[in-house]
């Protein structure tokens, strides 16, 4: 997916100089992730379990994100984001776990897989467009591709829960830039059902603090460090599903304005 997106960006770059876009910012980040919480229960007789039961807190995991933001004039922005997350751990179960009617007895050595890939589209309206300070508000829609699976290492038992769903959220972003062009930012997506959607209770949040600095005099290429908290889950009684997780990320990234880079590239002979 990452290679396909980068190829598409390179193919479309020659046309950017003639486009009405004010900016087209490509961004990539990577770094370690840690699981603070990952609780689950699946099936009418399902057993509640935690991240510790599956050794998910024993390691850091590599994370990455790719985003592309189109700035349409001074006020409007559209962001496309791809955020994969896929981990597998091995554990000796400290208790019996019933997963969708399949019972994994105490002492069973299992491989546990947790997949949560996110494809997100966001719209932002620039409410404040100051020289140093900007504030955007808007909304996001995320398609999530989720899979939770347990499998005995000896091959005797296997169970899984998979789902593709659509989640909406409100979004805001603030950024302050110093005269040196070093900048700090806060970005958040969040929504809760507050128990208003019948037999479903759930929520989602994605909050990031960023410190960035320019890598060239033009200021159209930046490096940044980012701390992110991501979490959410749902209790869906009609489907006998409960999952709630909280994850932390510490990443480094780079972003580049493709429109600006094309405009100042030397003309072809």
Say what each PLM segment does.
Residues 17-85, 251, 255-259, 269:
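Short glycine/proline- and aromatic-enriched beta-strand/turn motifs that initiate or cap beta-hairpins
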Residues 212-269:
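Predominantly the C-terminal beta-signal and adjacent terminal strand-loop region
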Residues 29-35, 83-85, 126, 140-144, ...:
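Outer-membrane beta-barrel pore domains and translocons
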Residues 36-61, 84-117, 143-164, 193-200, ...:
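Extracellular/periplasm-exposed beta-strand and loop segments of Gram-negative cell-envelope proteins
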Residues 21, 73-75, 128-132, 144, ...:
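Outer-membrane beta-barrel channels and translocator barrels
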Residues 67-71, 124-126, 173-175, 210-214, ...:
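Transmembrane beta-barrel domains of outer membrane proteins
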Residues 143-221, 230-231:
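Outer-membrane beta-barrel transmembrane domain signature
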Residues 24-28, 66, 76-80, 121, ...:
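Transmembrane beta-strands of outer-membrane beta-barrel proteins
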